[in-house]
């Protein structure tokens, strides 16, 4: 599972996801890509599930790039705990994804295989996505 090695602060505010992604919205490394169409928090488990699905489907050959990284800690309070007494402890990590962000890139495989691999990875994501081909 992906997570930062160290951070300056253990806990973060939730924040809000306004607008579209201006960074990381172009294909940089591969030939085919998966692009987010909705804003969401994508957990490190979901990122890993998508990555595994793609590598398993592309089988031999092909290179895969994961373009998002979970750098936001999400805190959870223990069950049946009364309100107050501070913020909960960090439970898991999420990547804040805005519309337009490239999630995965792949190259070195035929388009048919890339489409299949990316569609399987897309089904693991909690948002609507689209398949892109670099010009």
From Swiss-Prot:
It comes from the Eukaryota. One of its GO terms (biological process) is mitochondrial translation. Keywords: Chloroplast, Plastid, Ribonucleoprotein, Ribosomal protein. It is found in: Plastid, Chloroplast. One of its GO terms (molecular function) is rRNA binding. InterPro entries: Ribosomal_uL16 (IPR047873), Ribosomal_uL16_bact-type (IPR000114), Ribosomal_uL16_CS (IPR020798), Ribosomal_uL16_dom (IPR016180), Ribosomal_uL16_sf (IPR036920). GO terms for cellular component: chloroplast; mitochondrial large ribosomal subunit. Belongs to the universal ribosomal protein uL16 family. Part of the 50S ribosomal subunit. PANTHER family: 50S/60S RIBOSOMAL PROTEIN L16 (PTHR12220), LARGE RIBOSOMAL SUBUNIT PROTEIN UL16M (PTHR12220:SF13). This is Large ribosomal subunit protein uL16c. The lineage of its organism: Eukaryota, Viridiplantae, Streptophyta, Embryophyta, Tracheophyta.
